[in-house]
């Protein structure tokens, strides 16, 4: 083949990955097409999904909040995973991925969901996690009242203690995101009328986080404009891409929104949006950040 122009050779009608190619650098060598595709990270149908995602999805929260995978990440948060979260790169972590710890699947529901929020800004990169099913059942209050709002409820004061301990045991205290959250702490005529800033780790989610909008929580009616005491104004990205994860068939679950003088919002076990009297016992399916 010496001194034969490559353009004078016949053109191949088909190409296989086992075909041999001539490579010329410091020396003349040969390589299969499959080797070239692999070494140059060229996306092709035979590429493993994880490899393809690493090539196609850029590092950072924006792209990862738009990519669903649903992979089991193992039985613990590894040092490599923690490093990716801390750096805000989130490589090999995607929506719907989950850690299976102590019989609970903790789903990744969003990346940097609370970043820069709060009266004191949240500056740590993090993933928002939520258990696939409720952890246990409890009432919002002993009686049918929403007095004091979510921050004044029995659920907020003591009912989440078990959830906080469960997530701390699963991920370690050093990896639980501590941030600032605005919460309703007073109610007038069945509508939130006051709020304040609180240190926050593990909370009940809100209607906004589940659905992307208020459904039963009070909203502007042309006469009154209720204040939304929250920084959680956007839907968790997981539920936008895979809404089947927004509810659990095992139980209806509490949300933190005040609906009336007697009821808080909930997510139905059939996927519906609803509300229930504060003394009713429903599922506790909390959300928190891992950093």
Can you describe what each PLM-predicted range is?
Residues 1-18, 291:
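Short, intrinsically disordered N-terminal pre-domain segments
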Residues 23-41:
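Short, surface-exposed terminal/edge motifs of secreted or surface/virion proteins that either
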Residues 3-11, 32-33, 43, 78, ...:
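Short, solvent-exposed coil/turn linker segments
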Residues 40-61:
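Heptad-repeat coiled-coil amphipathic alpha-helices that mediate oligomerization/assembly
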Residues 54-291:
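Collagenous Gly-X-Y triple-helix signature in extracellular proteins
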Residues 17-25, 106:
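Extracellular disulfide-bonded cysteine-rich modules/repeats
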